[in-house]
């Protein structure tokens, strides 16, 4: 929670979640030339009959966000309520179990995977108690125990890896950023 008990909630993450799990929803989806979904408010709002001609204007963005939220709430009330519950970092914390699988939806994952990956929480962050370190289970987990720490560091933090070298798929799931996931 923030000042005055306010919370944050990114409706685009909820839209990604809807796309990944409820493709039959009443939202209309925009795709690029490669048939990958586009999750940008200035594209999603007009595709769903929501006025958004003044994209990136604060008030226009707020109204478009409310319009998308209303469509999701009206068409998928249980999913909407679940997503809304994830605004509470304590609720998120209760749902995260170390080494248990969870489907995590986030803009950090490629659209070609519906921004969703099967992950597991490896640990809670050593410095911040409001986040967990998650690992993408599509990647070979033996890398975590077989590689030396210098090699792990390289696979995590090198900006541009050599061609053919896959980045280690470890991300932070931050509890107070309304993460979208299903345990």
Residue ranges and their predicted role:
Residues 1-77, 86:
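Metal-dependent phosphoesterase core characteristic of DEDDh/y 3'-5' exonuclease domains
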Residues 14, 30-31, 62, 92, ...:
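Extended aliphatic helical segments
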Residues 6, 129-132, 176:
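Sequence-level motif detector for i,i+2 pairs with an aromatic at +2
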